[in-house]
Amino acid sequence: MSQAKTGILLANLGTPEAPTPAAVKRYLRQFLSDTRVVDTPRVLWWPLLRGVILPIRSPRVAKLYQSVWMEEGSPLMVYSRRQEKALAARLPDMPVALGMSYGKPSLESAVENLLSQDVEHIVVLALYPQYSCSTVAAVWDELARILATRRHIPGITFIRDYADDEMYIAALVNSARASFAKHGEPDLLLLSYHGIPQRYADEGDDYPQRCRDTTRELVSALGLPPEKVMMTFQSRFGREPWLTPYTDETLKMLGEKGVKHVQVMSPGFSADCLETLEEIAVQNREFFLEAGGTKYEYIPALNDSPEHIEMMVSLVTTRR
């Protein structure tokens, strides 16, 4: 019996199509309308989103995107397309398609792309190393919606996450060591993960534990003493409590306490984007230096590095 033709769906969050208020508004409207992201009752959320948040945030966020926009486009899209191309080159017999939860290319277009190539089994790799209901589960929901009305659906392998995968940890270790070799070993390595509301964790999201799993394996592999590493959470939104400690407040505190040299890595981001290139590399650098620090480096995401691509190859070929 011949083996079913398998395709790979690479999934990520998404990005505006242009660094303009109009494009950012379209993107944020879709992103912030997902109940996996914001679960406030719609009767309360819609007026706030449409009447206050989108009009105020869209122009401001557009300016931030303009500061990091690359010649080829949005950093997240540029690196995601490179990942897609590199993975396809490594797996010539397995079609690869990129799909975003919000914006273009959509997850639906990616699924249609694969099915048009007579794929009978799809391996879904959501490029979020640590599971969260607001990221990985949102991909699951959309995939279920896409397939809900089909008479014939393909076999599905859904990779929940890879927080402690050996090849993922090894790639992070080598990235950190390369930064240490270039800039000197810092007084402290800060591991900054994207935050989620504390309430989501209280209700069962194991994201904080998966972040701790990554941190534990990374610190062990690096051989650093515990006092030279901290784990924090960034990018909080809204007024309710999010996972702590907060990255920005921690960096201010470190500068005030006399820590002079920090390097910051964001292990939860598979590709550099606004939250790493602007929030971490620029905003938080300023917070640390203004508080008394003297040396600050951001360690880039794994992006389309060869080690990262090999990790993807391993995940999609061994977990199906």
From Swiss-Prot:
Gene3D superfamilies membership: 3.40.50.1400
Cellular localisation: Cytoplasm
Record EC number: 4.98.1.1
Keywords: Cytoplasm, Heme biosynthesis, Iron, Lyase, Metal-binding, Porphyrin biosynthesis
Pathway note: Porphyrin-containing compound metabolism; protoheme biosynthesis; protoheme from protoporphyrin-IX: step 1/1
Domain of life: Bacteria
GO cellular-component term (any): cytoplasm
Binding sites annotated in the UniProt record for Fe cation: 194, 275
UniProt cross-references to InterPro entries, sorted A to Z: Ferrochelatase (IPR001015), Ferrochelatase_AS (IPR019772), Ferrochelatase_C (IPR033644), Ferrochelatase_N (IPR033659)
Reaction equation(s) it catalyzes: heme b + 2 H(+) = protoporphyrin IX + Fe(2+)
CDD domains per UniProt: Ferrochelatase_C (cd00419), Ferrochelatase_N (cd03411)
GO annotation, biological process: heme biosynthetic process
GO molecular function, one term: metal ion binding
PANTHER family referenced in this protein's UniProt entry, alphabetically: FERROCHELATASE, FERROCHELATASE, MITOCHONDRIAL
Family named by the database record: Belongs to the ferrochelatase family.
Its job: Catalyzes the ferrous insertion into protoporphyrin IX.
Record-given protein name: Ferrochelatase
